[in-house]
Amino acid sequence: MRNIKQLMSLKGRVALITGGAGHLGFAMAEALAQAGAGIILVDMDQAKVQARVVDLKKKYKLKAVSMSMDITDKNEIKSLPQQVFQKMGRLDILINCAALVGTSYLKGWAVPFLEQDLETWRQAMEVNLTSVFALAQQCFPLLKKSKNGSIINIASIYGVLGPDMSLYEGTKLGNPAAYAASKGGLIQLTNWLATNLAPEVRVNAISIGGVFRNHQEPFLSRYKKKTPLNRMATEEDILGAALYLASDFSQYVTGHNLIVDGGFSAW
């Protein structure tokens, strides 16, 4: 039987993280890097993702590369596996973190229902759901060769729960229908992929609660009151779940939606 350090180790493995220049994507990259993984950061913001890779290399003395790409472009996604193989030689972990979220600035997004825009709905589905299917499809051959393949989809409690819109009254925040629908679809896609890519590749989701981004009152107090642990999440709160699902700690876990929300959904 392996010891705890061996089960947690990602030494020799390679992880690709979409949305890698963002707060959560980069935090997960750092966690996996500390466990020994090589890192591929994918993001549309070329300058920012390149700077993130420089930071990773400086801190952890590991192999890390950046890729600037539009994950809704089918041609760019098709070219991804070849680029990954050329740059890193393998792929063991795929984390789908890129997403349009409730605080994204889009036309007809975080607005009342009758004002929500159909084109923005379609864009959210492309980014939050369709891209995950396409990336899994293209990366599966490399993940299958790994023998330790793991896909982690970053979902949301709002893929499971209906929103309490009273949280947002009197604020500029909102909870778009497209966000909830795309994240609910992502959880079901996780189940579908888990049964179809097994036994070679495990597929799981992490449904996170609200992550603190300098939220102001009255939203902050309202959210804390609805959360048994009486606070919003930080990036650090998600890292244990990500490392667990990426490593052999979860070698017998697939098709699971791990909720990390401070108890928000426990009421």
Where do the protein language model's features map onto the residues?
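Catalytic loop of short-chain dehydrogenase/reductase
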Residues: 114-120, 144, 152-198, 210-211
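Canonical Rossmann dinucleotide-binding motif of NAD(H)/NADP(H)-dependent dehydrogenases/reductases
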Residues: 7-40, 193
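Short, small/polar-rich loop/turn modules that mediate ligand/substrate recognition or access, typified
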Residues: 95, 148, 198-202, 253-255
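Amphipathic alpha-helical dimer-interface segment in Rossmann-like NAD(P)H-dependent oxidoreductases
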Residues: 82-85, 99, 123-145, 158-159, ...
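Conserved mid-core segment of classical short-chain dehydrogenase/reductases
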Residues: 78, 100-122, 164-171, 215-218
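Conserved glycine-rich Rossmann-like NAD(P)H-binding loop of the short-chain dehydrogenase/reductase
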Residues: 37-52
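C-terminal substrate-recognition "lid" of short-chain dehydrogenase/reductases
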Residues: 198, 231-266
